[in-house]
């Protein structure tokens, strides 16, 4: 939608800028890059895909303020979580069947050990998973298994987590980075130009996440990777530290500065 407007504005000499959220740019932004005054990118990984009129500027992607302010210890206390690792998993607001199925297998395989907490959001399309698991697990007696349809306190849940299993949308990636969270990323395979794969690969290449393509995902594989990570907390900590190194915590300010520079 914005493509024709930006192109017309640039032709008229009106200051113009674009911002690319993903590690693999969309067609429109790549085309506009040759015309606009500023190309802002979320991650340096996107740099090589642009043939821009002016040098690209890494601004990061703004995240909600509550994600920046969340306190891990307070969040864990509010969730009733003790010192055991907390695994947070989700597949988006609608849910993702492949992720739900794999997480269900993982929980059923591991919950009896009671050495971890599991907080899983099924999404609206997967809400039946809660009833299915409640028939196999006494959730009152196993309070370390926490199932929800939707997470409306993401700042609290992600802050409290020791490992996050999720998709690889741009906003989610930025939140993982600013919070310094290790993750297992399962990109949505039908995203435009497969951009979630490249977002996940960016973290995996920086030793900040494990990337599993959905076509390769099953319960046994997910469980094995979780076992490997949870049994090596030093590695998990390193993943989190590497994610934090990639974070841009002043993205809004950087974007504002770029815009102000071209309208002076």
Please annotate each region the language model reported:
Residues 235-249:
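A short, well-ordered alpha-helix in the C-terminal region of glycosyltransferases
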Residues 226, 230-234, 259-264:
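Short, hydrophobic alpha-helical segments
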């Amino acid at each position: 939608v914005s493509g024709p407007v930006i192109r017309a504005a640039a032709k008229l000499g009106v200051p113009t800028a674009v911002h690319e959220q993903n590690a693999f740019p969309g067609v429109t932004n790549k085309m506009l890059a040759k015309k606009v005054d500023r190309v802002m990118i979320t991650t340096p990984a996107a740099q090589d895909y642009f043939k821009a009129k002016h040098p690209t500027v890494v601004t990061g992607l703004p995240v909600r303020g509550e994600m920046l302010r969340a306190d891990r210890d307070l969040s864990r206390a509010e969730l009733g979580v003790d010192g055991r690792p907390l695994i947070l998993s989700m597949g988006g607001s609608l849910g993702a069947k492949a992720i739900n199925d794999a997480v269900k297998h993982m929980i059923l395989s591991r919950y009896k050990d009671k050495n971890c907490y599991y907080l899983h959001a099924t999404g609206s399309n997967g809400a039946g998973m809660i009833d299915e698991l409640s028939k196999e697990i006494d959730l009152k007696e196993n309070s370390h298994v926490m199932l929800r349809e939707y997470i409306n306190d993401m700042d609290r849940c992600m802050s409290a987590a020791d490992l996050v299993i999720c998709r690889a949308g741009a906003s989610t990636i930025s939140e993982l980075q600013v919070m310094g969270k290790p993750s297992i990323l399962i990109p949505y395979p039908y995203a435009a130009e497969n951009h979630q794969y490249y977002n996940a690969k960016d973290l995996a290449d920086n030793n900040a996440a494990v990337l599993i393509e959905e076509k390769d995902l099953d319960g046994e594989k997910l469980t094995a990777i979780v076992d490997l990570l949870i049994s090596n907390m030093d590695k998990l900590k390193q993943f989190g530290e590497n994610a934090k190194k990639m974070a841009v915590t002043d993205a809004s300010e950087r974007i504002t500065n770029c815009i102000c520079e071209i309208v002076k």
